[in-house]
From Swiss-Prot:
Pfam families: DUF2279 (PF10043). The gene is yfiM. The lineage of its organism: Bacteria, Pseudomonadati, Pseudomonadota, Gammaproteobacteria, Enterobacterales. It comes from the Bacteria. NCBIfam families: PRK10759.1. This is Uncharacterized protein YfiM.
Length: 107
């Protein structure tokens, strides 16, 4: 129930400062690479802490995506560059890729 509430809050709340950006560029590559590395690092860290494979996968993905969403929230302040759904999409793509690469290297 809490997850549904948080997702609803994020999707239904308005953002006063949106970014006017494109789908490509150096910024997007940085989001992708950083999220991939954070996801793989989160997976590896949680495995070393004794978590199961499923839990470590969830931890790594959520760790990476939550940091990406936090960065976008920081950007949405009036002095920032604005919230970018495109940046967040690249964060999710990078986190998924980082998880996949981490899984492939573990076998």
């Amino acid at each position: 129930m809490r997850i549904l509430f948080v997702c609803s809050l994020l999707l239904l709340s308005g953002c006063s400062h949106m970014a006017n950006d494109s789908w490509s560029g150096q910024d997007k590559a940085q989001h992708f690479i950083a999220s991939a590395m954070l996801s793989a690092a989160g997976n590896e860290y949680s495995q070393h802490q004794g978590m199961s494979r499923d839990r470590s996968a969830m931890f790594g993905l959520m760790f990476s995506v939550s940091l990406g969403a936090s960065k976008e929230l920081w950007d949405s302040r009036p002095e920032g560059s604005g919230w970018s759904w495109k940046d967040l999409a690249w964060d999710v793509a990078g986190a998924s890729t980082g998880y996949t690469v981490w899984q492939l290297t573990r076998h």
